Amino acid sequence: MTKVETARSLALAVLEDVFINQAYSNIALNKHLKGSQLLAADKGLVTELVYGTVARKLTLEWYLSHFIEDRDKLDSWLYVLLLMSAYQLRYLNKIPDHAVVNEAVELAKVRKKGSEKLVNAVLRRILREGWPDITSIKRKNKRDSIAYSLPVWLVAKLKEEYGEERAQAIFESLLVRNKASIRVTDLSRKEEIQTLLEASDSSLSPSGLVKEQGHFAGHDLFAEGAITIQDESSQLVAPTLDLQGNEQVLDACAAPGGKTAHIASYLTTGQVTALDLYDHKLDLIQENAQRLGVADRVQTQKLDARKVHEFFGQDSFDKILVDAPCSGIGLLRRKPDIKYNKETADFASLQEIQLEILGSVCQTLRKGGIITYSTCTIVSEENFQVVEAFLESHPEFEQVELEHECKDIMKDGCILITPELYGSDGFFISQFRKISD
């Protein structure tokens, strides 16, 4: 019997990659969709099933624990199928229950004869008995962990940083599907492009447009370089460098190159040197720069950002961007699997790397030059504590107070955007100026 590819069979294959083989959800999804013959609407359903199931994983596991006696006795793929089916029954009202059950039974039948009986029994029992009540969980952090599908340590951490009320708003925002967000490369065309794409102005970035849903990468405007996909919060980074056009700029952790290209767009006779550790990522930076028409101002270099001072001399750069490797806690809406692969210990080791990078690049900056330090995380260990530690160990630098018209994203002279404020990625931006040699 020939296996017919359906949206659910493809989504199951992606979810197996993510849950069993520890693949990144966005990479696994793109890989499977690329080779698929499915229609656009079905590909949309695959995306919904994958991101929805991954985002709600802890909640779904808790629900299933009331209907399955011993999950360890089940084949891994079968448990993943039940997770995906439970997601549809609980959260996708547009799909009739009987269709979810029938599709799951058919998938099980194709995979392993006899397994469809268990799938049918579990799903019908859920429909018969209803969903267990999460509010019955007595411990508050555990209850929030299950309700919002976040590990208990992260629930506790965000409450400690932001207080109960704001943390709760952050938790809720992380389960809302992220908007499609683009940067318009030529502001004189912004209005025209906004009309063409039926998009709205970004509340954060003057060059940004947003839309509830949209596949901008397939648009002609993307191919011709009139727009590029970049989150609103990330669009705030390059303008902080206050580029005049003739500077030598270093982008120390550049891949995939969105900020590199943004920096290059401000340059005329200047140049941005973009670093990464991997050749394939450097290729991405070049491709991006080429598409956006700024390749003549971008030079790539394979180099560990912690070794910049060994390769470049003093006074090599006027401006430096360190968009540092970080825990990515601000990206949980777009990359939900991040939350299951982290622990508190990561923050300390990441802080060490972040300070090492700053300590290296600062040696190549001319007097009067600036460093912008940014992350896509919202925990203080990687943000304010890094700023404090860097200034403490480098008296030749001072903090530059950043400004933005949205006052709710300003804190201690830095920009701190949490995901609930504008429905964007969580993000942090700070800046230092070299005042002496």
How would you name each of these model-derived features?
Residues 1-437:
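S-adenosylmethionine
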